[in-house]
A protein has these predicted regions:
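PRPP-associated nucleotide enzymes
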Residues: 2-359
Length: 359
């Protein structure tokens, strides 16, 4: 730093408090540009609405033989690029498109590239649990980094240790900030509420929710046979008789686990059953199963676009996680601590997250 620059800093310092001055000095010189993969266009648009920026202009084309073509239709040289793409429904094509986007931005001289992956479906494949299988989460992490991503932002990984598969920074967001606030909005948070984990593996998540809401925990004891999506719920550990039960989990595909736990809770005398999930990757049969179950309401986020299959649902409510991801982008861009962000979420974030939920 030369004498002239130092003099300028000393001159302006008297007009700002210490925190504001540090924020200005640390702020990146890049320009935020958000692009959408084909799996997450509505989500990315909501992020842009929150940030007050326009969605990046782009073209995605699927050729007749199934090949994917992507192109940024505006200059991104020296810009900070955020590409939004969930790996949920049709995960193979979604992932391939994501790494093509990252490569395209790298070759177009972006200042930085952040992969925003609202739902990272391959995080379920985090270990070699039988002979001669691939650790798919690690393969995905390697590809994302090799193609040029500088950072990854995702939410509620099925296996949190997947963060360790990346050598670049990973910002791991939590839906609990949104879902617990919506539980309060519903008026179910009181001394009669019990948070229920559908299995022992999710007990840590349930405890985190219970700590936020100030209530007790119960656990569903289940046995999963094979690698299909149809586990057998066996028992409920904990007192749920006459209680309002809030079942929490990271995702559902078939709805089988949730519904079997719900029936188990009813058998134990539960008064009402709600389900709160970070992600839902559902089809018509899963929606039908949930609609016919004892679950009074299922609340999830929009990390995976289920608009078509949920249009006739009376039980499933969707809160938007896009404002939370947008606030994370702002935090990254201004080089602020992510932990501080979660402790000081703006009121407008919750307002935007819930604005379409009760319609």
């Amino acid at each position: 730093m030369n004498a002239r620059s130092l003099s300028a800093i000393i001159t302006i310092a008297k007009y700002f408090d210490e925190g504001e001055l540090l924020r200005i000095m640390n702020s990146t010189n890049g320009i935020i540009t958000v692009f959408a993969g084909s799996a997450s266009r509505p989500f990315a648009q909501k992020m842009c609405d929150y940030l007050g920026v326009e969605l990046g202009k782009s073209t995605t084309h699927i050729f007749s033989e199934g090949g994917i073509y992507v192109r940024a239709d505006e200059s991104i040289r020296n810009k900070d690029v955020y590409i939004v793409q969930s790996i949920g429904k049709d995960p193979n094509n979604a992932f391939t498109e994501l790494i093509f986007w990252i490569d395209a931005f790298k070759r177009a001289s972006a200042n930085s590239i952040t992969a925003i992956i609202p739902y990272f479906g391959y995080a379920k494949a985090d270990k070699k649990d039988e002979p001669r299988v691939s650790i798919r989460a690690r393969v995905c992490a390697d590809c994302i980094e090799m193609c040029g991503a500088d950072r990854v932002v995702t939410m509620d990984l099925h296996a949190a240790q997947v963060q360790g598969f990346f050598s670049k920074p990973v910002d791991h967001l939590y839906a609990s900030a949104l879902l617990c606030e919506y539980a309060r909005h519903l008026g179910i948070v009181n001394e009669n509420l019990v948070v229920v984990s559908p299995d022992a593996g999710s007990a840590k998540r349930a405890r985190a929710y219970a700590n936020i809401l100030g209530c007790n925990v119960a656990i569903g004891d289940k046995v999963r046979i094979g690698h299909d999506e149809n586990p057998n719920a066996l028992e409920i550990i904990g007192d749920v008789k006459g209680k309002t039960c809030m079942v929490v989990d990271d995702f559902t595909i078939s709805g089988n686990t949730l519904c079997k736990v719900a029936y188990g809770l009813m058998d134990k005398g539960a008064k009402e059953i709600y389900a709160f999930l970070s992600h839902a990757i559902v089809k018509e049969d899963a929606v039908k199963r949930i609609e016919e179950s004892p679950i009074k309401m299922l609340v999830t986020t929009d990390t995976v676009d289920n608009t078509d299959v949920l249009k006739n649902s009376t039980k499933i409510k969707v809160v938007s996680a896009a404002p939370l991801f947008a606030e994370a982008v702002r935090t990254i861009h201004e080089r602020e601590p992510m932990a501080y962000m979660f402790e000081h979420l703006p009121a407008r974030l919750m307002e935007m997250s819930f604005e379409d939920t009760d319609k």
